[in-house]
């Protein structure tokens, strides 16, 4: 919904379609909203729980983990690593939506009814390679020892490259590639089907206000 809402305010080309830049900006807006409101708190909690199960066993449940983290470290802990998450998610949404909206019209004559599946899968592949470094930095920053080892997201990225080479930033690409290509195919197919059946997601463009006549 954020993407469609933001796209209402984006410029159109001569055919009445949102421009490439418009799709990119709308995608980034969707990514920022998703990152700040949902992903960063959720990813911090998930990473803490995974690390805890492999180590000290400080948390009895998700609810207990939330209470303990807020009491001990403050609510701001849930937004630790918000910069790399936002960079990753805004870029991810920008690449995913822009790629899909560029690929779908090109593939339509060849793929027909399968266009959304193929375009969604390809958009997922492109997204993985463009955003994997942000994902690896985010994961390292949100680990239990992240705040002790790394002073910033940039410091984390530098240490990953120094210790493992540039390829370290793309570690774990293959499993994520499989996951996002399948997820992209399913998500965009469902999205297009919902739009086709209901039409409620396609919001009208905001018309420009005509200037008032001079008195």
From Swiss-Prot:
PROSITE patterns: SOLCAR. InterPro entries: Mitochondrial_sb/sol_carrier, Mt_carrier_dom_sf, TXTP-like. Pathway: Mycotoxin biosynthesis. Keywords: Membrane, Mitochondrion, Mitochondrion inner membrane, Repeat, Transmembrane, Transmembrane helix, Transport. Its main location: mitochondrion. The keyword Transmembrane applies. It is a multi-pass membrane protein. Pfam families: Mito_carr. It comes from the Eukaryota. One of its GO terms (biological process) is mitochondrial citrate transmembrane transport. Tricarboxylate transporter; part of the gene cluster that mediates the biosynthesis of the host-selective toxins (HSTs) AAL-toxins, sphinganine-analog mycotoxins responsible for Alternaria stem canker on tomato by the tomato pathotype. ALT1 also selectively transfers methyl groups at the first and the third cycle of chain elongation for AAL toxin. This is Tricarboxylate transporter ALT9. It comes from Alternaria alternata (Alternaria rot fungus).
């Amino acid at each position: 919904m954020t993407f469609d809402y933001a796209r209402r305010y984006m410029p159109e080309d001569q055919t009445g379609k949102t421009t490439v830049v418009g799709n990119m900006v709308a995608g980034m807006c969707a990514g920022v909203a998703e990152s700040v409101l949902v992903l960063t708190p959720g990813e911090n909690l998930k990473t803490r729980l995974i690390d805890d199960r492999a180590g000290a066993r400080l948390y009895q449940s998700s609810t207990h983990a939330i209470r303990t983290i807020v009491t001990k470290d403050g609510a701001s802990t849930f937004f630790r690593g918000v910069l790399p998450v936002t960079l990753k998610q805004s870029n991810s949404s920008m690449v995913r939506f822009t790629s899909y909206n560029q690929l779908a019209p090109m593939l339509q004559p060849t793929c027909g009814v399968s266009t959304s599946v193929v375009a969604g899968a390809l958009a997922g592949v492109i997204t993985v390679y463009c955003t994997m470094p942000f994902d690896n930095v985010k994961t390292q920053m949100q680990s239990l020892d992240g705040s002790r080892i790394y002073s910033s997201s940039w410091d984390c990225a530098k240490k990953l490259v120094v210790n493992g080479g540039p390829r370290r930033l793309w570690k774990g690409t293959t499993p994520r590639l499989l996951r996002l290509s399948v997820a992209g195919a399913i998500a965009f197919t469902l999205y297009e089907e919902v739009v086709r059946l209901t039409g409620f997601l396609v919001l009208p463009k905001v018309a420009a206000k005509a200037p008032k006549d001079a008195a």
